[in-house]
Each structure stands twice: as structure tokens, then as C-alpha cells.
Amino acid sequence: MNKKSTVDLIHGPILPALISFALPILLSNIFQQLYNTADILIVGRFLGQDSLAAVGATTAIFDLIIGFALGVGNGMGVVIARLYGARNFEKIKEAVAATWILGIILSVLVMLMGFFGLYPLLQYLETPAEILPQSYEYISMIVSCVGVSFAYNLFAGLLRSVGDSLAALGFLIFSAIVNVILDLYFITQLQLGVQSAGLATIISQGLSAILCYFYIRKSVPELLPRLKDFKWNKALYVDLLEQGLAMGLMGSIVSVGSVILQSSVNSFGAVIISAQTAARRIMAFALLPMTAISASMTTFISQNFGAKRPDRIVHGLRLGSYISMAWTSFACVFLFFASPSLVSFLASSTDGYLIENGALYLRISSVFYPFLSLLLIYRNSLQGLGQKLLPLVSSFIELFGKIIFVAWIIPWTGYTGVILCEPLLWLVMTAQLYFSLSKHPWIKEGKKLLATGGKS
């Protein structure tokens, strides 16, 4: 294993280890966001507002697909991180072999569902008729190549599961640059239209997947299975599938709620769609440090769970919460003042109505970011502890809450209801996850050990 890029999450001071592990994840997330932001900036600037709205109208579907792929990859990585914490290297190879087989099967199923269901779904979401063809062109490209997203997220999840969050960063930076170059070339030189933005994203993710594979082959060979490792192990397959689907479905359930909410956004017309698209992209960037810390908690807790260190789990949980809360408080203040300028820049527009609504979205939702930070920390911690059902409960709370808002509240309050929907649900979900986590026996044991100065 490449020790230089691998962070030891089981031994030594926790804060430096968490920061060292989370920083490459943060930078990776930044460049991951650049995939979509490059699409938005280039599409809006060179193809016009209708094309921008066409991409924006598919945001929830895009998040549904990519979120599922990311969740499955990270979920299976949780199992491998637990095995790595226990230093069970033979079982790790079997687990990796199983993730490859399951990844192929899930990719085919998602592609088939997308092939038959995409156009009716866009119609159900009340996508405006003038942008419907472009929306379908863009998102159908993403869905037809979903296997590429699965491959990259599986490989990146493997690297993170053993504490190597740095390696995937270099590959992702390279592919993000390629994505921007291809966007510009396809749209401005070949004039291929909005579909080419999706093609550029797929090619870029494919490069990341290929580079990750060759890095693992050279530097982390213990992650590569042998032919004899491709064997049926019911308990292992069930564990991987349950954890992978739990995290994949969690992201998908959240995204289904977003798809439902998107139908309300689409009903307000192309200008509001563009405002929402720009505001959501800014929000995603503002929350990147928080999401990096919460993502690192999954691996940290899973490895220490395998190593039987409840004291480190509780200590790490506290430190992660403090860091995340501090950042989101800063982001709230920053967005209050900078929102109008940021929305105008990202939407490539001086339309006062668009800027006003995009800025309003950011100013209201950012007040609730500290609660969102705790929500993600608690949920990822439960996943790291191997809990499958409790994190899903929070996702169902969000789904049903969005259905209630779309059916009864937004028709009465208008776009303000769209803005308030998610923040109010964050409060409920955070409370549910806090009580679920605090009752976990490992958290109770870790608190006792820290209170008495003991060590597991």
C-alpha cells in the first residue's frame, strides 16, 4: 500500500487525521461540482437561457442517478473499511470482487429503467414544452452511460475505505479539466448542442475510473481480487448489497423528493428554474467543506468500528460536529451579503426577478445550514456503525415532507414554500438522527470511556 497517501484513522491524534483525510475529499468535491457548474456556465453563456433551463430542469433526475451510484459505492466501501479496520485482507479481496459483480448488475438495471422511464418522468415533472426536447437529450446521455459513474464511484469508494482520499483527487482534477475543455469544444466548435455537455461529463468520469483502476493495480494491489475471490459468499453479498443499497436508496429517496419538488419549481417557469438552478449550485459549493467532513466520518467511524475503538468514535464525532458547525455559520453570513452577485454570475443574467429569487433562496436556506451539518454528521456516523434502517428513516421523513409541501403548502405560499421546504425538514431529520445515534450502544460505551479517561 502507498503509505504516503494513506491516512491512519485508527491510531494517533484524531483531529489532524480527520483534516488530512477530509481535505482531499473536499478538493475532490470541488472538482466534482465543477463538472456540473462548467455545464451550467458554458450552456448558459453559449446556448442561452432556454438551454440553461433545460439542464436545470433535469437537476433532480441527475442527482437521483448520480446520488444512487455514489451511495452504492460509498455503502459498499463502508463494509470494506470495516474489514480494513479489522485488518482482514483476505476478506477484503472477496468483498471487492463482489462489489464489481453487484456494480455491473445495478448499472444494467438503472440503464433499463432510464431507457423506458425518462421521457414520461420529464413530462410528469411538468417540464415546460419549449425546453423538454433539450432536457431529454441531456439527461438521456447521462443515463445511457450510468455504468461509467458506477465504476468511478466504486473505485473512489475503495480508495477512501482504506484511508486513501488523496489519490482519487489527482485523477478527478485531471478529468475536471478535460470536462471543461470538452464542453467548450463540443458546444462552441462542433456546435453539438446541450447533449454534448452530458457527453463531456461522461467522458471525464470515465477517465477518472480508468486512472483509479490503474492506480489501485500499481499502488494498492491488496484491493484487487484474484480469480479465486470471485466466489459466492451469501453473507458477504448480503452485507454489501444491504449497505450499498441502503446508502444508494437513501440518496435516491432524497432525490425522489427533490424530483417531486422540482415539479413545483418547473411550474413557475423558465426564469425561476434558472434562479433555482444557480442558487442550488452556489449552495452546493458553499456546503462542500461540511460534506467533506461528514463523508470522512463514515470511513473514520467504520474503520474504528472494525478496530473496536468506541472512544475514538465518540471523540471523532464531536470534533467533526464542531468543525462542520463552524464552517456553516461562516457560510450563512457570507451568502447573506454575496448571494445577488453570485446568482447573477452563475446564471449569466442581469434579470432582476431571477437574481432576486435566487438570492432569496440562498439567504433563507443558509440560516439552517448548521442544522444540515449535524444532520449529515449524524447520518454518516450511523452508516459507519453499520446501521442501515435508521438513516433510511430520515430519508423517508424528507420524502413525505416534500410530498406534503408540494401537495398543500407550495400552492398556497408560492416559491417561498419551495425555499422553506427543505430547511424545515432538516430540523425534523436532525432531531430523529440525534436520538437514534445517542441510543447506539457504541456511542454510550464511547462516552463512558471518555468520561472515565479509559481506552478501549
Language model regions located:
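Small-residue-rich hydrophobic transmembrane alpha-helices
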Residues: L52-L112, S149-A168, Q276-S339, L372-G386, ...
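Helix-terminus/linker motif at the lipid-water interface of multi-pass membrane proteins
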Residues: I30, L34-A53, L122-A129, Y185-L192, ...
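Short alpha-helical transmembrane segments in multi-pass integral membrane proteins
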Residues: M1-A22, I80-C145, Q191-L245, I301-V367, ...
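Structural signal for membrane-spanning alpha-helices in multi-pass inner-membrane proteins
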Residues: G114, G157, D183, C212-I216, ...
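Transmembrane helical elements of multi-pass membrane transporters/channels
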Residues: S20-D39, M141, Y152, S175, ...
